[in-house]
Amino acid sequence: ADEEFKLDYITGAGGISIPEVAILEAKKEVAKFGEVTTRMNGFVRTLINDQDKKTRNKMFNKIMKYEEITDRVEVEVANYLDQVSRQEITPEVSAQIRSMLSITNDLERIGDIYYQISKTIERKDDKKIYFLPEKEKT
């Protein structure tokens, strides 16, 4: 189910009607985007705390997949908000669009950082370097 992630609340250009309604839908999508990065946090925590090789490989793969999802969602939300901004909008809607673009950029960057952390952990594992000395025995 994770690999099938898609936008639930916003659609292409044909789906934009009233800017205020479009903004509400985009807000829901941004909140859902936040949940994706929260899941990535859990995956990284598992990488740090779980030494089972199979579990760790699963987490590495999930983080890589989720990083791709964050890239895609940022672009799709930004494109949607760009379409909304081309309509006649109020200053308040314009400010909300700018805010959501900033948030989606930050969430995508968080996804990148989690991915970079996972790659660092992977390199650390390959070199048999451990966070805690007792992990060296396993």
PLM segments and residue spans:
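Cytosolic, long alpha-helical scaffolding segments
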Residues: 1-138
